[in-house]
Amino acid sequence: MAVKVAINGFGRIGRLAARAILSRPDSGLELVTINDLGSVEGNAFLFKRDSAHGTYPGTVTTEGNDMVIDGKKIVVTAERDPANLPHKKLGVDIVMECTGIFTNTEKASAHLTAGAKKVLISAPAKGDVDRTVVYGVNHKDLTADDKIVSNASCTTNCLAPVLHVLQQKIGIVRGLMTTVHSFTNDQRILDQIHSDLRRARTASASMIPTSTGAARAVALVIPELKGKLDGISIRVPTPDVSLVDFTFVPQRDTTAEEINSVLKAAADTGDMTGVLGYTDEPLVSRDFYSDPHSSTVDSRETAVLEGKLARVVAWYDNEWGFSNRMVDTAAQMAKTL
């Protein structure tokens, strides 16, 4: 029997998580309802026509206040308080919480009050939740007691699989990350006030340094790296696809060849298959649009100085890769119902 999923918040990640569910019937997930304050007509149109990922290949129509995708009716609501959503009536098992608002235990618990069994937050948690998961690294740690789970961030999902392999095979003393990140909705189209004055500037006109907790958050899934990592983000004028540039001190002398070898082996086998990618080609960001991997190692960029300072670069579609991990993590949570 399919696991029934609700999506709360139908923005970039909400819409793409819906696409990912619908494109992957093998996941065992069934999308039954969407909650968003926008009009059903507007949401249906934006779901069908995506500037980064193209037109949805199936049919998308509306029927009254609901959406019909590939002939299947999806109940649509516009409720501000998640506690009032019809989760119990619809038999919702897992909520994908994609608003960016209900990101702690207290707020996300409203979905449990409404009758859902578990909640997967599409963002780093603000405060304690039952578990933060990066699929491919610690997803097998999920238990029946994990009711409210964070899927971390797109950047943590890119970085953590790479670091997981490096920590196991070589060891990491300390490291710094820079993510060269496409602009997001948390920036301004034209100069306008923002709590971060750099993000207040026109997103399409500048490279914009800003903060990120993605590197530090890796410690939530790889505890032995706590306090050993930090990083920054540089937002750039592209609508999708980002890269992580990670420099680290290895625990022992290493070479670029060894680093590439262990990362390629991990990409080809085991839990990292489909999560971690690897390429020898001279690719650019446009080549990674709609790539479902969490991260793809660019072997041409791997470098080591005197065996004691190393650099690894990995690409990621910060929208589609992350949305696919939402599906994977939800499917893993379903096994604990």
From Swiss-Prot:
GO molecular function terms attached to this record: glyceraldehyde-3-phosphate dehydrogenase (NAD+) (phosphorylating) activity; NAD binding; NADP binding
Subunit structure: Homotetramer.
Name of a matching Pfam family: Gp_dh_C
Function text: Catalyzes the oxidative phosphorylation of glyceraldehyde 3-phosphate (G3P) to 1,3-bisphosphoglycerate (BPG) using the cofactor NAD. The first reaction step involves the formation of a hemiacetal intermediate between G3P and a cysteine residue, and this hemiacetal intermediate is then oxidized to a thioester, with concomitant reduction of NAD to NADH. The reduced NADH is then exchanged with the second NAD, and the thioester is attacked by a nucleophilic inorganic phosphate to produce BPG.
Subcellular localization: Cytoplasm
Residues the record marks as active site: C154
Chain positions of site Activates thiol group during catalysis: H181
Family: Belongs to the glyceraldehyde-3-phosphate dehydrogenase family.
Keyword check for NAD: yes
Binding site for D-glyceraldehyde 3-phosphate: S153, C154, T155, T184, R199, T212, G213, R235
An example Gene Ontology biological process: glycolytic process
Source species: Zymomonas mobilis subsp. mobilis (strain ATCC 31821 / ZM4 / CP4)
EC numbers, comma separated: 1.2.1.12
Protein name: Glyceraldehyde-3-phosphate dehydrogenase
Binding positions (NAD(+)): R12, I13, D36, R80, S122, N185, N318
Swiss-Prot/TrEMBL keywords: Cytoplasm, Glycolysis, NAD, Nucleotide-binding, Oxidoreductase
InterPro entries the UniProt entry points to: GlycerAld/Erythrose_P_DH, GlycerAld_3-P_DH_AS, GlycerAld_3-P_DH_cat, GlycerAld_3-P_DH_NAD(P)-bd, Glyceraldehyde-3-P_DH_1, NAD(P)-bd_dom_sf
Disulfide partners: none
SUPFAM superfamilies in UniProt: Glyceraldehyde-3-phosphate dehydrogenase-like, C-terminal domain, NAD(P)-binding Rossmann-fold domains
Keyword Nuclease in record: no
Catalytic reaction annotation: D-glyceraldehyde 3-phosphate + phosphate + NAD(+) = (2R)-3-phospho-glyceroyl phosphate + NADH + H(+)
GO cellular component: cytoplasm
Gene transcribed to yield this protein: gap
Pathway connected to this protein: Carbohydrate degradation; glycolysis; pyruvate from D-glyceraldehyde 3-phosphate: step 1/5
